[in-house]
């Protein structure tokens, strides 16, 4: 930065005025790092992050001979409904009524064939090639038509679980979650006399033991998940602050964070059509279940099908209700097709709540559907960026970023972060353009699964936002010498630096930040500032960091106001839902 001062004092007239303007628009020094005037607003675009959001269902019928794999997935986020009815003697596949006959065709209890498993693998490969993701459910209901009593004898369910596990284990990069169907109509664990809590728990635990921890496994209700985790008297013991819960949580360890639930009765009644109990002494009621999801489902997918309200029940299927409870349950995915009447109503209803940048006074025709669609799962916004001004002889680059997660939920799988250095200069007498572009991987300690969304707590009669989703991300990386990247001399030339966050898979699908993406298309990342390389500088170590003062100035704090909570951040203040006051 000294170079700007030298040039400033050597210039006169118009050139001096131009440089003063440039200097005023340039970043400001603070504690050895430079605060960049980057775009810090949510552009309110619907982002192409397909590991969350609205899914499209697609059925895959597996046969002993294999069947036809999914060649063209219908969406980037697919609900892959793989059904294995031909491997169950209890599943009737059709009725031949020709000539007055009524001959029923049944499946057959048998091992899953290699051909069938290959078709499942080919379908997952197609999803990967499409740069998509899938929520996977496997069941015995033919073509997902809602037939009852289709589940085979329990020993066959267990055999099929063990045979499916290797395929599922190989594809955790595209499987968002496994909805543990395997029982009942639609794979929803109802309408089947073969269903018991013990059988569902045994099958689910077998799947847990035979698949890696990256695969999140969901059951249909909180009661089933409680049984899987080892609770027997869940009406009494399934309270996250209770002694029995603490005992089981300690014994289960990380499995507590791997088991979740899917909800295909979502918001249809205050009980979600039986998902939550009405008698809290014998079942898990809504508040106990939500508190469990809030704590242990922090990185576990949650969603399903939102329904219209049943007659004479409380109406909770509104965007306004989701703008509160969605953050507690970390809701991350929903069916775009069901219930279509409810979704159509969301598209026609204006969203009249202010939630940070989602402000109906800023945006005309902000619908409830757009609010929900944009907030399912995670949504990262770069709010502040401080970076090293000069990379010296040691090649060290440092950054301090404030990234807010404004989505309902969090990342549910590991990703890789990296820095991208990009720049151009004119070289030679013909002003030929030279460019530089290279990527520097960041350590696994920079974990975006920990860039958490807001935290809302119930404290007596108060609803308090105790954390507003602003996360501090500290980066230290060795960018190395540019001599190893390009033959040109880049000393003193400002180079752009981007933060890039991508899935660790062959297609390198990257996360889109909610900031304006016009500039960020260069790198598939988010612009965090510029840096100058100068090897005459012996060290890039920042000058005396005044960390305490910076934190005091920038960190939000919670203040009570008339039985509510507001989060104050500098001169801004927000209501509990993030609306500006």
Question: Where are each of the predicted segments found?
Answer:
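Extracellular/luminal regions of secreted and cell-surface proteins that mediate adhesion/ECM remodeling
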Residues: 373-538
């Amino acid at each position: 930065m000294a170079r700007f001062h030298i040039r400033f004092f050597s210039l006169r007239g118009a050139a001096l005025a131009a440089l003063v303007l440039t200097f005023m628009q340039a970043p400001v020094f603070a504690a050895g790092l430079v605060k960049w005037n980057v775009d810090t607003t949510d552009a309110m675009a619907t982002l192409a992050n397909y590991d969350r959001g609205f899914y499209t269902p697609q059925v895959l019928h597996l046969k002993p001979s294999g069947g036809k794999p999914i060649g063209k997935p219908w969406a980037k986020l697919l609900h892959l409904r793989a059904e294995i009815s031909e491997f169950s003697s209890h599943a009737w596949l059709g009725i031949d009524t020709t000539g007055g006959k009524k001959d029923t065709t049944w499946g057959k209890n048998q091992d899953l064939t290699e051909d069938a498993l290959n078709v499942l693998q080919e379908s997952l490969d197609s999803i990967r090639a499409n740069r998509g993701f899938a929520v996977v459910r496997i069941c015995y209901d033919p073509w997902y038509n809602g037939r009852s009593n289709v589940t085979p004898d329990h020993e066959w369910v267990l055999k099929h679980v063990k045979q499916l596990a290797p395929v599922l284990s190989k594809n955790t990069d595209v499987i968002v979650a496994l909805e543990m169907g395997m029982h009942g109509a639609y794979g929803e664990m109802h309408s089947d006399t073969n269903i018991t809590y013990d059988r569902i728990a045994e099958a689910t635990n077998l799947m847990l033991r035979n698949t890696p921890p990256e695969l999140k496994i969901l059951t249909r209700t909180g009661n089933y998940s409680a049984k899987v985790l080892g609770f027997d008297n869940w009406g009494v013991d399934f309270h996250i602050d209770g002694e029995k819960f603490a005992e089981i949580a300690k014994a289960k360890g990380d499995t507590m964070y791997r088991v979740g639930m899917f909800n295909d009765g979502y918001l249809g009644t205050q009980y979600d059509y039986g998902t939550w109990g009405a008698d809290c002494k014998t079942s898990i009621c809504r508040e106990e279940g939500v508190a469990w999801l809030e704590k242990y489902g922090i990185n576990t997918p949650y969603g399903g099908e939102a329904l219209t309200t049943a007659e004479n029940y409380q109406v909770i299927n509104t965007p306004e209700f989701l703008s509160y409870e969605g953050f507690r349950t970390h809701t991350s995915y929903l069916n775009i097709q069901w219930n279509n009447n409810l979704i159509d109503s969301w598209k026609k209803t204006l969203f009249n709540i202010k939630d940070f940048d989602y402000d109906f006074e800023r945006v005309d025709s902000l619908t409830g559907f757009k609010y929900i669609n944009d907030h399912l799962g995670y949504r990262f916004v770069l709010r502040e960026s401080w970076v090293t001004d000069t990379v010296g002889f040691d090649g060290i680059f440092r950054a301090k970023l404030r990234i807010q997660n404004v989505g309902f939920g969090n990342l549910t799988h590991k990703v890789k972060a990296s820095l991208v250095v990009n720049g151009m200069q004119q070289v030679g007498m013909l002003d030929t353009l030279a460019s530089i572009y290279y990527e520097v991987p960041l350590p696994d300690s920079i974990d975006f699964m920990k860039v958490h969304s807001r935290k809302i707590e119930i404290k007596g009669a108060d609803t308090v936002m105790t954390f507003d989703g602003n996360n501090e991300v500290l980066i230290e990386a060795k960018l190395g010498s540019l001599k190893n990247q390009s033959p040109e001399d880049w000393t003193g030339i400002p180079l752009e630096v981007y933060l890039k966050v991508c899935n660790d898979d062959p297609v390198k699908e990257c996360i889109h930040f909610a900031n304006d993406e016009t500039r960020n298309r260069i790198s598939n990342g988010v612009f965090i500032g510029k840096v100058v390389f100068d090897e005459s500088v012996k060290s890039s170590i920042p000058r005396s960091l005044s960390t305490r003062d910076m934190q005091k100035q920038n960190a939000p704090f919670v203040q009570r106001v008339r039985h509510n909570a507001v989060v104050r951040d500098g001169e801004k203040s927000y209501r509990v839902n993030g609306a500006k006051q």
